Curated annotation (Swiss-Prot):
UniProt similarity note: Belongs to the flavin monoamine oxidase family.
Names of required cofactors: FAD; Mg(2+)
Cofactor note text: Binds 1 FAD per subunit.
GO MF annotation list: metal ion binding; oxidoreductase activity
Superkingdom to which the source organism belongs: Bacteria
Protein name: L-amino acid dehydrogenase
Function: L-amino acid dehydrogenase with broad substrate specificity. Catalyzes the oxidative deamination of various L-amino acids, L-Arg and L-Cys being the best substrates in vitro. Likely functions mainly as an L-arginine dehydrogenase in vivo. Probably feeds electrons from L-arginine oxidation and also from the oxidation of other L-amino acids into the respiratory electron transport chain associated to the thylakoid membrane, and does not directly interact with molecular oxygen but donates electrons to the plastoquinone pool. Cannot use D-amino acids as substrates.
Pathway, per record: Amino-acid degradation; L-arginine degradation
Regulation of its activity: Inhibited by Ca(2+) and other cations such as Ni(2+), Co(2+) and Zn(2+). The inhibition by o-phenanthroline and salicylhydroxamic acid suggests the presence of a metal cofactor besides FAD in the enzyme. The L-arginine-stimulated O(2) consumption involving slr0782 is inhibited by inhibitors of the respiratory electron transport chain, such as KCN and 2,5-dibromo-3-methyl-6-isopropyl-p-benzoquinone, which indicates a participation of the cytochrome b6/f complex and of a cytochrome oxidase.
InterPro entries for the chain: Amino_oxidase, FAD/NAD-bd_sf, Flavin_amine_oxidase, Flavin_MAO
Record localization: Cellular thylakoid membrane
Induction: Up-regulated when cells are grown with L-arginine as compared to the growth of cells with nitrate (at mRNA and protein level). The increase is substantially higher in the PsbO-free mutant than in wild-type.
């Protein structure tokens, strides 16, 4: 659901000619991983066809411009210093970056109290700590060291094969939190990380495997500052730039319903046609790949896997103001807390526009209660929470956008998919293994930076490389 008006889509539907119905490789899905796979194959003169269910490109990489000229990324938006594949892509397309606004005091709201502090929650806490009780703070930090040590013992390439993996995968993250934190703040802090920071979901701690959370931290650590920078013009401009290299090789608005394969090739059936190729790459989240029927059927472990990997629960809120008023108060525009709806918010303003933009999120169990309310009540709830962080000016935005990812039938949630208990060790071996002529891509299967754009790029590159080796 989107509440907006007067905006320009950064990745609108392409005006494309009818592509050839036969090619070297068919790519299902035009998210970043699918587009990268198609581009890399095309660059070495293999013919490709990208088939997308939606009427637009990009999947979770999707943006718009406000009437003020400020861009907003309705999907992912940040990049970090160790996300080398994403940084290489930005450099290739001459997309400029700027530091995520962070100057000033951050705000922690906990149990009705407000704390301003000059530090960062990036892995091990850095800088000045919030002035909560030392017992509560020490509880969270001691537990964090235990969590980090446990995560470092994992093999990020093969989490299903790590030492004691069965034991870790049999527990929820909530089990670990209960055992390792002893104060209300410690309990909330780790629950918040699971919901707001995500470690892939976001999910409630009771829903996600401890093994999966640990793997997410090892693969995509907040300690590497993945939200260090934003992009001038937004990440949503990237799909169109890649698509420009693919010419008439993209079909939009054609959901794939069936893929057949034999020893000669594949046939992909959409709601309106059939297309032949030598190989296929399915570049969607696992649950969407599971909606497609296959002939011959997928192996049992693959079929079982796609039934068990849900998307995280997240609605992104983008609220713009005539100026970043919080800076006048010495605030950074970054807040976290156990408020009614908004546990995390961040300044996403482009310094070249003068407009103030706050990105925030309603996640986990909060989402179900919030989305059931009326539009006006939802808006008031979000703005009231932002006022607790930044002051009464937050109640009067210029624009207010709800990006309801769980309602998107061809996405189904955000930020990414997660593994409930038992899934990694019972079915994880089927996550990325090709099945005959069908290969997989998507940020969920990345061994490094899973859940981020960088992970999506890595899997698109890997899938294309594998296909090139077979053609």
């Amino acid at each position: 659901m989107v509440i907006r008006s007067g905006k320009t889509n950064l990745n609108p539907p392409c005006a494309l000619m009818a592509p050839s119905s036969s090619c070297d490789c068919i790519i299902v899905g035009s998210g970043l991983s699918g587009l990268i796979a198609a581009r890399n194959l095309s660059r070495v003169n293999y013919s490709v066809l990208v088939i997308e269910a939606q009427e637009r490109l990009g999947g979770r990489m999707y943006g718009e411009y406000l009437p003020s000229g400020q861009w907003i990324d309705r999907g992912g938006q940040w990049v970090g210093p160790t996300q080398d594949r994403f940084l290489a892509l930005l450099n290739e397309y001459n997309i400029e970056r700027f530091p995520s606004p962070a100057d000033g005091l951050k705000v922690l709201l906990f149990d009705g109290k407000r704390y301003e502090f000059d530090g960062f929650f990036q892995g091990v806490f850095q800088g000045e700590a919030p002035k909560i009780s030392s017992d509560e703070w020490n509880d969270a930090m001691v537990a964090w060291e235990k969590f980090n040590t446990l995560a470092q013992s994992l093999d990020e390439q093969h989490p299903e094969a790590t030492p004691e993996n069965k034991k870790l995968d049999s527990q929820t993250f909530a089990d670990w939190i209960k055992e390792n934190t002893h104060t209300a703040f410690g309990h909330w802090y780790f629950s918040y990380m699971c919901r707001a920071v995500g470690f892939l979901g976001p999910a409630e701690p009771s829903q996600v495997s401890l093994l999966h959370i640990l793997w997410g931290h090892k693969s995509a650590s907040q300690g590497e500052n993945p939200e260090a920078e934003l992009l001038h013009g937004g990440a949503g401009q990237i799909p169109q730039k890649i698509a420009a290299e693919l010419g008439n090789s993209i079909l939009l608005g054609e959901p794939v319903i069936h893929i057949a394969q034999d020893d000669k090739g594949v046939e992909v059936t959409t709601t309106t046609g059939k297309y032949q190729g030598k190989f296929a790459i399915v570049a969607t989240p696992p649950h969407l790949a599971g909606r497609i029927t296959y002939s011959p059927p997928m192996p049992p472990l693959r079929q079982q896997l796609t039934q068990r990997v849900p998307m995280g629960t997240c609605c992104k809120l983008l609220i713009s103001y005539d100026r970043p008023f919080w800076r006048e108060k010495g605030l950074a525009g970054i807040g976290l807390g156990n408020t009614t709806w908004i546990e995390l918010c961040a300044d996403s303003s482009d310094p070249t526009t003068g407009v103030g933009v706050i990105a925030s999120f309603v996640v986990g169990d909060r989402y179900g209660k919030w989305i059931a309310m009326g539009e006006a009540e939802r808006r008031q709830g979000v703005l009231s929470d932002l006022a607790l962080y930044f002051g009464e000016e937050a109640l009067s935005p210029e624009t207010y956008d709800e990006v309801d990812w769980p309602s998107e039938q061809w996405v189904g949630g955000g930020y990414a998919a997660f593994m409930p208990p038992g899934v990694w060790t019972s079915f994880g071996q089927a996550l990325s293994a090709p099945v005959g002529r069908i290969h997989w891509a998507g940020t969920e299967i990345a061994p490094r930076w899973a859940g981020f754009f960088d992970g999506a790029i890595r899997t698109g590159e890997a899938a294309a490389k594998a296909i090139i080796g077979l053609l």
